[in-house]
Amino acid sequence: MVLSPTDKSIVKAAWEKVGAHAGDYGAEALERMFLSFPTTKTYFPQFDLSHGSAQVKGHGKKVADALTNAVLHVDDMPSALSALSDLHAHKLTVDPVNFKLLSHCLLVTLACHLPAEFTPAVHASLDKFMASVSTVLTSKYR
């Protein structure tokens, strides 16, 4: 998915609004994913997956940090996310569909917390951005 200059600008502005809440929103998106798509829990057998778990919060922060890195390097996401792509493809062997599920849950989380800012244009640009991130993360599977 190719992000237009407008999409990139919208994504950067939206992510600035997320700001210091990024880790919390990442954890909430993970919780939503685990509740809505229980099979995703199989990738985290060692985690306490209960609401507010320190492990889920910690992983939510990792997700948010990776997305922040992708936003900062939106013009070269393949390089910026290369190590993460290797990890998910070769060590963790995460089914690629799970990136789409988490992307959806993150969009829902952002819409809940930023309703005024989550316009149709922002939704569309963030959706394209998340699809691009998912594509990069699954690129090493081939």
Curated annotation (Swiss-Prot):
Q: Encoded by which gene?
A: HBAA
The Globin domain, residue ranges: 2-142
Question: What function does the entry list?
Answer: Involved in oxygen transport from the lung to the various peripheral tissues.
Enumerate the Gene Ontology biological process terms: hydrogen peroxide catabolic process
| Name of protein | Hemoglobin subunit alpha-A
Q: According to its UniProt record, in which tissues is this protein expressed?
A: Red blood cells.
Enumerate the PANTHER family for this protein: HEMOGLOBIN FAMILY MEMBER, HEMOGLOBIN SUBUNIT ALPHA
**What's a single GO CC term here?**
haptoglobin-hemoglobin complex
Q: Which UniProt keywords apply?
A: Heme, Iron, Metal-binding, Oxygen transport, Transport
The organism is Otolemur crassicaudatus
